[in-house]
Regions:
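A broadly conserved amphipathic alpha-helix scaffold signal in soluble, globular proteins
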Residues: 14, 148-152, 191
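Sec/Tat signal peptide C-region and signal peptidase I cleavage site
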Residues: 22-28
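Hydrophobic helical h-region of N-terminal Sec-dependent signal peptides
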Residues: 10-22
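Bacterial N-terminal signal peptides that target proteins for export
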Residues: 1-13
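Pocket-lining segment of extracytoplasmic ligand-binding domains
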Residues: 89, 160-164, 169-253
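Short, glycine-/small- and polar/acidic-enriched structural segments
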Residues: 29-157, 162-165, 181-185, 202, ...
C-alpha cells in the first residue's frame, strides 16, 4: 500500500497554523482516529508505532471503528473523531452538507477491492439480470457509486432494482439467508464472502470506478495541531511501505 501525502494541503495547513500562531500552542491531549476493517490504519493500530511517536509530544491515541465511510464521515462532522480514512464518495456528501474537512493523504486506486456479488448458486449471471432484484449496500459509500456505474454500463436505471440499505455486517447476514439477491461490498467483506460463501462476482470496479481512499482531518483540529497530523501521516506512510515489504507479516495482523 503506497500512501501519497497531499503536500499542498499540508503546506497550506502549516502556513495557516503559522499565521494563526497555533504552532506555539500546547499540543492536543488526545488524537481520535476513525478507522474501518481494512487498509493501512488497521496495520498502524496493530503495530502501535503511532502511540510511541505521539507520546513524545504528550498526545494519546484513541481508536474508534466504523462500519463504513458515511458513518465515519458523520463522526468527523459532529466532532467525535479528528481523523479518518474513507473512499472518495462519502466526503462528497459530507462536504455538500457543510462538513469542514481537510484532505491530507491518499492511497492508490483499488478498483478490484469492491464488487457486486451474488450467491454461488444464484441464477443471476450478469448485472443486466438484476432488474427487479434486491441489492444490499451501505448507503452513500464507494460501493453505492460502483452500483450506479455498473447498472449504467448494463443498460439499467437505478430505479430498475430494489436497493436495501444495510451496514456491512447486516448486509452479509441478509445475503446469507437469501433476503437480498445481490450485495455490493468492499474488502475485507468482499474477500470473506468469496472465500467463505463462494459468492460470485458480477462486476468489480475495473474500468468503471477507481475506488480511491482518502485520509481526512477536521480542519479545525488540523489547523490547531499540524505537528500531530504530520506525525500521523508520516507513520501511515511508513506502515504502508512496511506492508509492501512484508506481505507475509501483514496477513498475520
Amino acid at each position: 500500500m503506497r500512501t501519497t501525502i497531499l503536500r499542498q494541503s499540508l503546506a497550506a495547513l502549516v502556513a495557516a497554523a503559522l499565521s494563526l500562531g497555533v504552532l506555539t500552542q500546547a499540543q492536543a491531549d488526545t488524537l481520535r482516529i476513525g478507522y474501518q476493517k481494512y487498509g493501512t490504519l488497521v496495520l498502524l493500530k496493530a503495530k502501535g508505532s503511532l502511540e510511541k511517536k505521539l507520546a513524545e509530544q504528550g498526545v494519546q491515541v484513541q481508536w474508534t471503528e466504523f462500519p463504513g465511510g458515511p458513518q465515519l464521515l458523520e463522526g468527523l462532522n459532529v466532532g467525535s473523531i479528528d481523523f479518518g480514512v474513507t473512499g472518495e464518495t462519502p466526503p462528497v456528501f459530507a462536504q455538500a452538507a457543510g462538513a469542514d474537512l481537510l484532505y491530507v493523504a491518499s492511497e492508490p486506486p483499488a478498483p478490484t477491492s469492491e464488487a457486486l456479488l451474488v450467491p454461488k448458486d444464484s441464477p443471476i449471471k450478469s448485472v443486466a439480470d438484476l432488474k427487479g432484484k434486491k441489492v444490499a449496500l451501505n448507503k452513500g459509500s464507494n460501493v453505492h457509486y460502483l452500483l450506479v456505474r455498473a447498472l449504467e454500463e448494463a443498460g439499467l436505471k437505478y430505479t430498475d432494482i430494489q436497493t436495501v440499505f444495510l451496514p456491512p455486517a447486516d448486509a452479509r447476514a441478509a445475503f446469507e439467508r437469501g433476503a437480498v439477491d445481490a450485495w455490493v461490498i468492499w474488502d475485507p467483506y468482499q474477500a470473506a464472502a468469496e472465500q467463505q460463501l463462494q459468492a460470485r462476482t458480477l462486476r468489480n470496479g475495473t474500468g468503471i470506478v477507481d475506488n480511491n481512499q482518502f485520509y481526512l482531518a477536521t480542519k479545525p483540529y488540523a489547523q490547531q495541531h499540524p505537528k500531530v497530523i504530520q506525525t500521523l501521516v508520516e507513520e501511515v506512510r511508513a506502515v504502508g511501505e512496511w506492508s509492501k515489504a512484508n506481505p507475509d507479516e501483514v496477513t498475520k495482523q
